[in-house]
Amino acid sequence: HSTSRRQRQMCIETGYNIILKKPINIGIAVSLNDGNLIVPVIHDADKLNLSGLASQIDTLAAKARENKLAPDSIQGGTFTITNFGTFKSLFGTPIINQPQVAILAVGYIEKKPAVVETPEGDTIAIRHKMYLSLSYDHRIVDGALAGAFLRSIADELENWNA
């Protein structure tokens, strides 16, 4: 996972200390029916495969919308992901979920023309594209680290093998 290779994004800032968290606990922003937002946490997310993550997201989102989350289900997050794409937004600027130091926003996936390199030369083809947006606390995560983190996520998504 990109998150396990880029541990500094998994810190929390407590005012006087920066704590590097070993477990990767991913918060997922869930929009509630009343217009509010809550961030349940997938604990030890780095130990789950894609199917396990999807199952946890479905379970936590359903519990959140039914107002049945246990208190520990919304605590201990080390990094949050929000999906503006749910609302067909291409991108947005996410606000860091304190005391975490970074949050990733995923935009709407849409078909776009793209230049594709082939043995015969460049050609235009239709590809699925989306924007990623990372907000981070620059006191802890610098631009080089943030850029490398986004690049590693893009590389994994672009070379996905299901």
Show which residues each predicted segment covers.
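C-terminal catalytic/motor cores of large multi-domain enzyme assemblies
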Residues: 1-162
